[in-house]
Amino acid sequence: FKYGDRTYNQVKEGMKASKTKNQFFQQYVGTFLKEYEGVKALQLPKQYKFPKQPNLMQLYVAYKTKQLPQFANFSEPGSGKTLSAVLASRIINSKVTLVLCPNSIVEQWGNNIKEIFPDSEFVFGNDIFSVKYDKSKYQYLILNYDKLNQAESLARINKLKKLKIDFIILDEVQSAKGVANISSKISRRTNLMKLL
């Protein structure tokens, strides 16, 4: 996408010049053009304060999330997934976003969210389970995966399910596997599925 506009224009011109009746080709190219136009038309929220503008991939993730709420971004590490996830949450106007991540990066998520959208409120730790929905705020509940395999996890998950969660971000989803808690025989993955 580095040369996005140039590529787009070349594809558009090539489509006009092409006399092919190949439906697959027409659909494939048509989808590319439609999605590219949708991404380019995306307006950043006024509250966006991150020093760098999002790249085309990050905008594409936000665009696709708006089109397909179950869209998942499995890009490589370092590709800007955090920015794309936070941006997507605002593009869809999520008032309560649940971020599930490893314990080691809970604070980092909070810092990143504040850097991108300073008007955000974030909560982590046990305070998450007493949050009230407030449509005047953008709230991010940052929960580490370890909270999903504790004795009280099921009761906490039920509290979260009653809260209107608009968007869920699963960071480093491989951490959701966990090991079953021997005493309760409840795994992170099982509790995660109950939450979703």
Task: Describe the predicted segments one by one.
Residues 1-35:
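Charged, low-complexity intrinsically disordered regions
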Residues 31-70, 78-195:
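SF2 helicase/translocase NTPase motor core
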Residues 73:
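Hydrophobic anchor at the beta1->P-loop junction of P-loop NTPases
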